[in-house]
A protein has these predicted regions:
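Conserved non-transmembrane functional hotspots
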Residues: 1-193
Length: 193
């Protein structure tokens, strides 16, 4: 019983809360982008036009951006679409900043508490690795997007060449599902005790 309490209170519960919070901030950012430019951004869940076989996000939503190069709609991936929205005067930079802040907390929690994963939940450890890799790329993108400090300007230093990002660095959606399942399993066990 004590081990389940520890797993829930130190890993699964906090992770679920952090992921849920990050997801809510992400959705508010989606709404802000839609209100800024509805011909470029849309949430298919709200339009009721989701096609069969489309992989929705863990909360059942599907946010898209119109890709002008491909002349078609595609799934919006924060890590891939960063430069087209961050620092572009769309009023969403604060949402991105907050998601990165929450990501720091998630990353630290994973690094400190991954040993509390339930033994039969090994797939979550793989998802943790994927998340940590994703977050390192996101963090680097965020750092490079910040204006140069006075010290950097005075020294003439630059933040380096733009980071090349691939789809593999996108947020691993499976992690939210696995954390939610684990949290629910532990809550059920604790309720019976």
């Amino acid at each position: 019983f004590d081990w389940h309490v520890k797993q829930f209170t130190e890993l699964y519960g906090p992770l679920r809360t952090l992921f849920d919070g990050s997801n809510e901030v992400y959705r508010r950012m989606n709404e802000a982008l839609i209100s800024q430019n509805p011909s470029r951004y849309r949430d298919l869940t709200l339009t009721g036009k989701i096609e069969a076989g489309v992989e929705v996000d863990p909360d059942g939503r599907y946010f898209e951006v119109f890709d002008e190069q491909q002349n078609s709609w595609r799934k919006f991936r924060m890590i891939m679409d960063w430069s087209s929205v961050y620092g572009q005067g769309l009023g969403v930079d604060g949402y991105f900043d907050r998601i990165v802040d929450i990501g720091r907390s998630i990353s630290k929690l994973i690094q400190d508490k991954a040993g509390l994963v339930m033994p039969h939940h090994g797939e979550l450890l793989t998802a943790f690795g994927n998340y940590l890799a994703h977050f390192e790329v996101l963090k680097e993108l965020h750092t490079r997007a910040q204006p140069a400090t006075e010290a950097e300007k005075a020294a003439g230093t630059t933040k380096g060449a733009p980071l090349k990002v691939r789809e593999a660095a996108a947020f691993p959606n499976s992690i939210q599902k696995l954390v939610r399942e684990g949290a629910n399993e532990l809550l059920a066990k604790l309720a019976k005790a």
